[in-house]
Structure formats: structure tokens, C-alpha cells
Amino acid sequence: MESQVRQNFHQDCEAGLNRTVNLKFHSSYVYLSMASYFNRDDVALSNFAKFFRERSEEEKEHAEKLIEYQNQRGGRVFLQSVEKPERDDWANGLEALQTALKLQKSVNQALLDLHAVAADKSDPHMTDFLESPYLSESVETIKKLGDHITSLKKLWSSHPGMAEYLFNKHTLG
């Protein structure tokens, strides 16, 4: 059944939103996996766990807001299976942060692609919706992850045995 509120909302935008919702839920799932790992009793890096749990919640909230937007525009939400994270264990915090950065860049690219579709389909409402807060927050998260990776690498070079502990306590704490 066609929506009575749908106006200037192209099917390509609708499909792109559904794909982005799935990617956001997958990202949330990956971050939750990281948080769970760092909260384990044999890892015990609670601020890493908190940092990744916050990323997980943020991605989940974004997915839910995208769903709400889809409904506001008269689109139809088609939830898909959420892919399991590729791994459950992480060698160290640096590896997890590097994986998170790669993931966040892929999320940002998906948002940029969706923005391009909306612009191509002359949907200024959707381009505006994506620009703030999603694209700006995504860039901020990429910067934060990059800064954390740089700081942890510097610590690692001067305090290899204590780097994760010090970073967990003083940077993330």
C-alpha cells in the first residue's frame, strides 16, 4: 500500500536508508563485541569497554532515528539480518581501535553515498537530515579514533608493557 505522506522521496533513497540502517546496527554489534571483550575478567580494561559501549549505543540510536525518518517520509522499513562481527577476541586495544576506525570510515562512506543519491534525486530534506548530525558526527568520530590510535602508538613506543593500561586509565578514563 502506498503511503499518503510520501512526497519527493525516491525509492533509491528509501532503499539506501534501509541499507544504512542495517550497517548502523552491524556497527553497533561490532562495538558491543569490542566492549564485551574489554570488559572480560581476563582483559579488565574498563574504560576501553565503556568507550566501545558508548559507540555501540550511538550507532544503535542512529539506526533507530533513521528508521523514524524513513517512516516520517512515508518510506517502508525493511529490516535485514544483522551480520555477526568477524571476531570476538582482540589482540589489544590498538588493534580494536584500528578496526573501529576502518568500520567508522565505511559507515561514513555509506552516509556520503546515501547523501549523493539524495542530492541526485533532488531531495533537499534528506540531504539536510544526513548532514547534521550524521555526517558531522561521523567525521568527529573518525578524528577521535585517529587521535586515540596516534596517542596509543606513542605510548606503546615509550612504555610497551604499560601502554594499554596507561591509555585506558588516563586517556579513556
From Swiss-Prot:
<feature type="binding site">
    <location>
        <position position="59"/>
    </location>
    <ligand>
        <name>Fe cation 2</name>
    </ligand>
</feature>
<feature type="domain" description="Ferritin-like diiron">
    <location>
        <begin position="7"/>
        <end position="156"/>
    </location>
</feature>
<protein>
    <recommendedName>
        <fullName>Ferritin, lower subunit</fullName>
    </recommendedName>
</protein>
<dbReference type="InterPro" id="IPR014034">
    <property type="entry name" value="Ferritin_CS"/>
</dbReference>
<dbReference type="GO" id="GO:0006826">
    <property type="term" value="P:iron ion transport"/>
</dbReference>
<dbReference type="InterPro" id="IPR009078">
    <property type="entry name" value="Ferritin-like_SF"/>
</dbReference>
<feature type="binding site">
    <location>
        <position position="59"/>
    </location>
    <ligand>
        <name>Fe cation 1</name>
    </ligand>
</feature>
<dbReference type="Pfam" id="PF00210">
    <property type="entry name" value="Ferritin"/>
</dbReference>
<comment type="subunit">
    <text>Oligomer of 24 subunits. The functional molecule is roughly spherical and contains a central cavity into which the polymeric mineral iron core is deposited.</text>
</comment>
<dbReference type="InterPro" id="IPR012347">
    <property type="entry name" value="Ferritin-like"/>
</dbReference>
<keyword id="KW-0409">Iron storage</keyword>
<feature type="binding site">
    <location>
        <position position="62"/>
    </location>
    <ligand>
        <name>Fe cation 1</name>
    </ligand>
</feature>
<dbReference type="InterPro" id="IPR001519">
    <property type="entry name" value="Ferritin"/>
</dbReference>
<keyword id="KW-0408">Iron</keyword>
<comment type="function">
    <text>Stores iron in a soluble, non-toxic, readily available form. Important for iron homeostasis. Iron is taken up in the ferrous form and deposited as ferric hydroxides after oxidation.</text>
</comment>
<dbReference type="InterPro" id="IPR008331">
    <property type="entry name" value="Ferritin_DPS_dom"/>
</dbReference>
<dbReference type="GO" id="GO:0005737">
    <property type="term" value="C:cytoplasm"/>
</dbReference>
<keyword id="KW-0479">Metal-binding</keyword>
<dbReference type="GO" id="GO:0008199">
    <property type="term" value="F:ferric iron binding"/>
</dbReference>
<comment type="similarity">
    <text>Belongs to the ferritin family.</text>
</comment>
<dbReference type="GO" id="GO:0006879">
    <property type="term" value="P:intracellular iron ion homeostasis"/>
</dbReference>
<dbReference type="GO" id="GO:0008198">
    <property type="term" value="F:ferrous iron binding"/>
</dbReference>
<dbReference type="InterPro" id="IPR009040">
    <property type="entry name" value="Ferritin-like_diiron"/>
</dbReference>
